[in-house]
């Protein structure tokens, strides 16, 4: 349990972000174009659809990988008890719902949606149940997780834009 449960976060990340590495730069324009009109205007003028380069995605995924790797190591170090590990595990699990909601909203494939219900959610549910059965208290905090992971996500996109 000490290694396997925190390591499952890395497996989940590798699957989901591997899918994003393979598909995001090629599908982003189509995804944004399929958004309902009221949601398109904040991301562009409606005439040009923003895209992200493959390099941007590579840098962003690598940067997020540092955060997820650090969280998994902290999870191993604390047998899943650390707030940092639990926050990242929780938010990574929850983010799968965002992929699925985006696919429903755009009525099509969005990068990351294939591994969200097949890997990310089952791994997250399994990890939570294993921690609960082991008597590990849930110390995660959604606001704290959003602050930490969200800030890191902004950093990952900024670095991706700089190095693209």
PLM regions: where:
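Short amphipathic, positively biased membrane-proximal segments
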Residues: 1-164
């Amino acid at each position: 349990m000490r290694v396997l449960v925190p390591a499952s976060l890395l497996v989940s990340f590798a699957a989901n972000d591997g899918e994003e590495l393979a598909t995001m730069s090629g599908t982003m324009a189509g995804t944004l174009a399929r958004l309902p009109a009221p949601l398109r205007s904040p991301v562009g003028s409606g005439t040009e659809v923003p895209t992200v380069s493959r390099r941007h995605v590579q840098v962003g995924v690598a940067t997020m990988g540092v955060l997820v790797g650090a969280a998994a190591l902290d999870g191993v170090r604390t047998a899943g008890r650390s707030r940092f590990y639990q926050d990242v595990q929780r938010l990574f699990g929850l983010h799968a719902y965002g992929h699925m909601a985006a696919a429903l909203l755009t009525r099509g494939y969005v990068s990351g949606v294939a591994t969200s219900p097949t890997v990310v959610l089952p791994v997250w549910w399994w990890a939570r149940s294993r921690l609960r059965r082991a008597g590990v208290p849930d110390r995660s905090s959604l606001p704290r997780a959003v602050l930490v992971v969200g800030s890191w996500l902004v950093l990952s996109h900024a670095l991706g834009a700089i190095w693209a």
